[in-house]
Amino acid sequence: MRPIAKFTNGLTTLPSGLKFALGLLFFMALSFIQSEAAEGQLGGCPCGCSGGCRFSGAGTSDEIDSRIGSRWNFTATDGATTGAGDAVTLTWGIAAEGSPIGDAFGANTGPEGSSFVDFLDNATARDPNSTGGADLTQRDWFSLFEDSANRISQVSGVTFNFESNDDGAPLFSAPAGGGLLAGPAGALGTRADIRIGGRSVDGQTGGNVLAFAFPANIGETVFDTDNVNFFSSTFNDSVGFRNVLTHELFHALGISHVDSAGGASFLLNPTINTSFDGPQLDDILVLQRNYGDFLESSNDQLGNNSIATATVLGLLSDDNSLSAGQEVDDTVIGFDEVGFVSINDATDVDVFEFSLSELSEVSIDLSPEGASYLQGVENGTLEEIDTLELNDLALQLFDSDGNLIAAADDFGLGLSESILQTLDAGTFFVEVSGSSDEIQLFTLGLSSSVVAVPEPGSVMIVVGMFGFLQVRRRRN
């Protein structure tokens, strides 16, 4: 069996993957590697060439789609799931100490029992009093796992729940005949969908493997417990450990590596980077393409695709504007940035509800969000993708009975749409849609100003004067 990683020119690169045997099906195993470059820096040209990288013309979300190898179609919580762009609920857990882990790298070391909890207690625990005991949630390092899982849920339709039970079943085995054999599927109260363990892999000197994971519907994730020096760093709240973990969870969700250049760096780059914290723009796009935005997990995973399940924005007034989405003007995304929403394709709609307490002039503005950068599949050709111009968005306004009041679809890719409408008190709905099979991040903003209504006495005076003038005209 071919190793999952190989080293060239002092840097670590990955082949296309390793064979994973499951009946007659083969899956790609994905690994995360550490460069010999300084912490926080990428090692070498992201596309793997020593000189200039090969670039070509403008890309579309085909470049995003090409990195989605699979998605979870059955989970312990949901049972059978639906299609791309829809939300899922997954359990994650720590494999019981001693759970067998096969030799994925052909080092002829044979299976080894997981020693991940012991490794975490000794390498990553920042409070020595937090170790020990059966309740892993009391460990000091447990918050690192929660932070990574919660961050994915904040920026996508994936809901992660911790499964505290684990029966010690093998994560995977490596039969003598070759290939790798998956362990059992997740089961509530027994084991998680995504089980995380650790064993010795290839040491911690030079370019080496930090962790690897199997794709969706398998999801087993293994950390190299040799890498004590790297994982013991508490720099920026252990960002190195958290970025590796979040990266591997992306693989467990069916998403593969991305190469990038021109100043754009992403969590799914093949080499570790601690200069940012968590998923970046391209990571969020590919994750939402596969599982939708966080609003898709609302209403028991029905999302906000109809008036009946609309996202309630609240009362719109002079001193209370409303909004949805997060502005994007760069590939860099801060760990505290939340609220990213998107239209997934031509069949996806997002519906938002707002209300008015008095006659008002309402302004509704819809803007696509994104940035331009170079990216491509690992070791492939890099293409420029402008994520501001992936899908042409449209805007519609409905009353409480679902009757269309106004619509805006006047401009093209990358341009905003707006509606200006005088509305009486009541409840209204805004629908956002797209025209093509592309993902598009967007922001929606609503503002209003009260329309002054004349006092009854003033109206009577005006009407009286008008009647007097009419009489005078008749007499003339």
Give residue ranges: language-model regions.
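A short, hydrophobic C-terminal helix/tail in secreted or cell-surface proteins
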Residues: 454-472
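N-terminal secretory signal peptides that target proteins for export/translocation
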Residues: 1-17
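Metalloprotease/metallohydrolase-associated module, dominated by Zn2+-dependent proteases
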Residues: 220, 225-226, 230, 256-344
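Bacterial N-terminal signal peptides
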Residues: 19-31
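C-terminal edge strands of extracellular/lumenal beta-sandwich accessory domains
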Residues: 280-317, 350-352, 373-403, 418-452
